[in-house]
Curated annotation (Swiss-Prot):
Protein name: Annexin A2
Domain comment in the entry: A pair of annexin repeats may form one binding site for calcium and phospholipid.
Gene from which the chain derives: ANXA2
Phosphotyrosine carried by residues: Y24, Y199
PROSITE patterns, per database record: ANNEXIN_1, ANNEXIN_2
């Protein structure tokens, strides 16, 4: 089996732009796919005394998201029951959370995680920030559409009623998904201007011109901002992350830090979040599950590579140490291998 390093080298040689994001996913479409057979096997597994969790995990973690939708359709046709409801009754705990997450489309999954982050008393700002800061324009536009479909209200409205101040402004601007797309022309003049404007609006003055930071960081393309943050160092004695820590506090600080880390290196950002979810006593399972489910078909190979490079041991190893049972098995399948 090729190591993740070999696969990434091969893909980068082929050129990033010609490579669909799924090429970096750990979960691929299953070759000999038969939705009817899978639906029958899952039905049998659910009916087995004590529930045959191993079969359920084996099937659903080794099929692409599109294939899982086909299985759910075939299951409903067979049994006149929804697969998600049947599995909700059959499973429990963290394993149930993983499996039900895998049955949703990526946009449905993100929409439901966002809704959960804003439901009831208090907001789970951490989850809100992670999803809104890390998704692409296309992903955010699809999330907005699906959110309205699922909850009969706008994502923006819910963000507005659940947040406040500059943090609200930043989240609303990002959630629109209207960032400039990657241009083929590099505008060095604008890079320099933006770097200087970020410095003038923050470290250089007393108080911070937050709207200026928001407009630059939510409107410019990712490759442009990567160059802006590099250029910024020639104006400021601090890099962008250090400047954020000096200039703003609370949820706004957290959001800007997450955003800049996502822009600089998204796979590393997720590797850090995964590490933080497992380090020390106890596991932050919600974060661990969300990243493993949502990135498994996007960039898990890159995340694994960054994780090993920074932390010296593989993501697979950490999951093995920190989880157990069929829940562990499901996460390891989504991880896709040891490095």
């Amino acid at each position: 089996m090729s190591t993740v390093h070999e696969i990434l080298c091969k893909l980068s040689l082929e050129g990033d732009h010609s490579t669909p994001p799924s090429a970096y996913g750990s979960v691929k479409a299953y070759t000999n796919f038969d939705a009817e057979r899978d639906a029958l096997n899952i039905e049998t597994a659910i009916k087995t005394k004590g529930v045959d969790e191993v079969t359920i995990v084996n099937i659903l973690t080794n099929r692409s998201n599109a294939q899982r939708q086909d299985i759910a359709f075939a299951y409903q046709r067979r049994t006149k029951k929804e697969l998600a409801s049947a599995l909700k009754s059959a499973l429990s705990g963290h394993l149930e959370t993983v499996i039900l997450g895998l049955l949703k489309t990526p946009a449905q999954y993100d929409a439901s995680e966002l809704k959960a982050s804003m439901k009831g008393l208090g907001t789970d700002e951490d989850s809100l920030i992670e999803i809104i800061c890390s998704r692409t324009n296309q992903e955010l536009q699809e999330i907005n559409r699906v959110y309205k479909e699922m909850y009969k209200t706008d994502l923006e409205k819910d963000i507005i009623s659940d947040t406040s101040g500059d943090f609200r402004k930043l989240m609303v601007a990002l959630a629109k998904g209207r960032r400039a797309e990657d241009g083929s022309v590099i505008d060095y003049e604008l890079i320099d201007q933006d770097a200087r404007d970020l410095y003038d609006a923050g470290v250089k003055r007393k108080g911070t011109d937050v709207p200026k930071w928001i407009s630059i960081m939510t409107e410019r393309s990712v490759p442009h901002l990567q160059k802006v943050f590099d250029r910024y160092k020639s104006y400021s004695p601090y890099d962008m992350l250090e400047s954020i820590r000096k200039e703003v506090k609370g949820d706004l600080e957290n959001a800007f830090l997450n955003l800049v880390q996502c822009i600089q290196n998204k796979p590393l950002y997720f590797a850090d979040r995964l590490y933080d979810s497992m380090k020390g006593k106890g596991t932050r399972d919600k974060v661990l599950i969300r990243i493993m489910v949502s990135r498994s078909e996007v960039d898990m190979l890159k995340i694994r590579s960054e994780f090993k490079r920074k932390y010296g041991k593989s993501l697979y190893y950490y999951i093995q140490q920190d989880t157990k049972g069929d829940y562990q098995k499901a996460l390891l399948y989504l991880c896709g291998g040891d490095d």
